[in-house]
Amino acid sequence: MDSGEIWIYSQKCGKIEGIQTGGIYMITFLASLFIKDRRNYNSPEVRQAYGILSGAVGIGLNILLFLGKWIAGTVSGSIAITADAFNNLSDAGSSIITLIGFRLSGQEPDPEHPFGHGRMEYISGLLVSVAILVMGFELIWSSLGKLRSPEPIESSALVCVILIASILVKVYMFFYNRSLSKKLDSAAMKATSVDSLSDTVATTLVLIATLISKYTGLLLDGWFGILVGCFILYTGGSTLKETIDLLIGQPPKQEFIDEIREIVLGHSMVHGVHDLIVHDYGPGRVMISLHAEVDVNGNIQDIHEQIDHIEHELQEKLHCSATIHMDPIVTDDEEVLAMKAKVEEMVHFLDESFSMHDFRMVKGSTRTNLIFDVEVPRKTSYTDNEIVNWLKERIHELPGSKYFAVIQIDHEYY
């Protein structure tokens, strides 16, 4: 491979390491120079360093693209090329926003923000998405003006070379930002990668319009500008929605839930886990709370010591703060266990996605109360009252008609 050739190098699993120019992987090489422990992607310090590095590279490349396209647009008289140049200038501004966002998100908690500043990264992603939308509207507006007053485009080999080089650079920026966004689980970098992809499509369409004008004389500059603007609006709207969802609050990934359950249930003293809630205050600022079912007859001091150990294990392995509530359950009363099994069967008969916990059996002189919680997903066709009434009726129909249900409905947060 020649020294000046640009090529994309893919690792296993489709992960992109970088683009080689003259035998150097830019991002990987720079990371090896400036980022200590660069493969520890869960470290807040490493995340911040990657964000600053990515932002700095983005600023430099986008300024170079702006200068090249501005020259090409001025020479050719193409409104689409000139608009695309200023799009790259706004991208440089977006890279500055991303850089500042990572810088702020890495700050330590303070009295005014005890949970840290991790969500500043989400806010920077939000601002990048808004910048994408603004650029889309401006491009459509300028393209409408071009439709009203079309002008011939002066094409040249220099213009085409600049546009092709711009496409290659933006493809590179898309891949390295997407790769980092996956490794760091970064909304800001994902927004930047989508922005780079939209720029790639935009510049490709501009190149096509330029070539069509050169060889056919058709003035499609304005139409292609509108098409590019609509695509930019779509991508900007998509990333805006995703970032807003993160700020409002999303359910955690199922893989994360499974990891938590695996760690907690890996301790023999824990018989079950429920009421699991994940509080996300930004990347690296995750807190979880859950209820762990333990034997009611167990030694409370030993159980408490084990619960402390589990909390530390979650902190060490998943980098999250954990608070665990101990729920005592009966494990050696045959009558209680048999009744619990019957009620669980009813709950699963109503809907297999439902689960039951905190089951207690309180006997009185004339009646027996069955007290328990039913955990249901957010998406269910039943209302809380329908679930409670159906279960109460089935339980009251049990032999003897002396059983009465006291039911609490819990909704999953994942």
Language-model features: where?
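Short, contiguous, helix-prone interaction/anchoring segments in small proteins
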Residues: 52-74
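Alpha-helical transmembrane segments and adjacent TM-loop junctions that form the membrane-embedded core
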Residues: 22-57, 76, 80-86, 90-414
